[in-house]
Amino acid sequence: PYVAPPSRPYRPSGFRGPFSRPLPPPPGWRPRPGIPVVNGVLGLTFGAGIGISLDYLFNNGYTVDGYGNDMIYLRNVPALNYIWTDATLYYGNGGGFDGSSFYYSTPYYDLGRYNAVYNTLVGTYGMPVAVNNGAGTLLSTWYGGNNGFITLRFNAQATVGGSVRYFTTLSFGN
């Protein structure tokens, strides 16, 4: 089944794009003792099927905006003590949940959300394992105790409505 999400002019144009895992941690990297594992989000465990995920989300009050064979679209989703206006949950070739992206945007350059979430992640996971800042993009990557990952990105993106907005994107994956 497929229920297309309604058009929202401020969604990033790539919110339906493919989900990809960052490069693995460097060979010498080891998680610090006690670092949390990254094994899911919103109470969903990586590997869960899309049907089970939809039931869970509907039954727990999440606003499901649409879904397809390999993605679920959500609105106004809590993550890391913030509300994210849009989120996409991604399901791999085997049908299991393997990643998510949470989006927050402003019409102007504003690093407030990025900096606050960055500081939260540093407090929990330590300094990022990888940082790639350049060409108008800030990108930091952390790994959990099980090599699950978190990325935090800030950049300007085209929106579905054709305008350019500044997005903070928080992604979790397996």
Language model features: what each stretch is:
Residues 77-111:
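Mid-chain, structured segments of secreted extracytoplasmic proteins
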Residues 33-36, 40, 46-47, 68-91:
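Accessory recognition modules or surfaces
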Residues 75-77, 92, 141-147:
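Active-site beta-strand termini and strand-to-loop segments that position acidic
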